[in-house]
Amino acid sequence: MVEAGDFRRGLTIEYDGQIFQVIEFLHVKPGKGAAFVRTKLKNIKTGAVIEKTFRPDERMPLAHIERREMQYLYNDGELYYFMDTQTYEQIALNQEMVGDALKFVKENMTVTILSHNGSVFGVEPPRFVELEVIDTEPGFKGDTQTGATKPAKVETGAVIQVPLFINVGDKIKIDTSTEEYLSRV
């Protein structure tokens, strides 16, 4: 059992007899009245997203989720193919199931496939990835403003904000959960 006040992004719960994944949550403490937790929940079977408000002390059961490490093989334009590195079993998932999870994932990287009762519902990328910058504006001498950033395109096609000293060809470390630059490698 988990209390609504302990919700985190990615947590899976049972609610109204169905399995939901917490997409967003916000703890609200109004000036007057009791605190509450405003959430966006995604039904893992149908993909439907609902908004629901809970009291922070409201309890609900956690859903048991199976996690399998698999290697991302390729995308044929329609489906994404993954392989279990121990059994060599391959599965194909559509864009709806994958979502933005592969935004920072190259072919042959290891990802986590999420399933419930044998039914796959999502993909979790590795927490940190190292990618090469393929396009960005050059940094100029004197661009030393604190915290200044510029857009940079990495080899997977995703665009993130990076510090001004990053150039084309640099390898950078990215946190996939926040989609933020961490360091130069």
Swiss-Prot record:
The keyword Cell inner membrane does not apply. Pfam families: EFP, EFP_N, Elong-fact-P_C. Pathway: Protein biosynthesis; polypeptide chain elongation. GO terms for cellular component: cytoplasm. PROSITE patterns: EFP (PS01275). The keyword Aminoacyl-tRNA synthetase does not apply. It comes from the Bacteria. Keywords: Cytoplasm, Elongation factor, Protein biosynthesis. GO terms for biological process: peptide biosynthetic process. Its main location: cytoplasm. It is found in: Cytoplasm. One of its GO terms (molecular function) is translation elongation factor activity. Involved in peptide bond synthesis. Stimulates efficient translation and peptide-bond synthesis on native or reconstituted 70S ribosomes in vitro. Probably functions indirectly by altering the affinity of the ribosome for aminoacyl-tRNA, thus increasing their reactivity as acceptors for peptidyl transferase. Belongs to the elongation factor P family. HAMAP family: EF_P. This is Elongation factor P. It comes from Caldicellulosiruptor saccharolyticus (strain ATCC 43494 / DSM 8903 / Tp8T 6331).
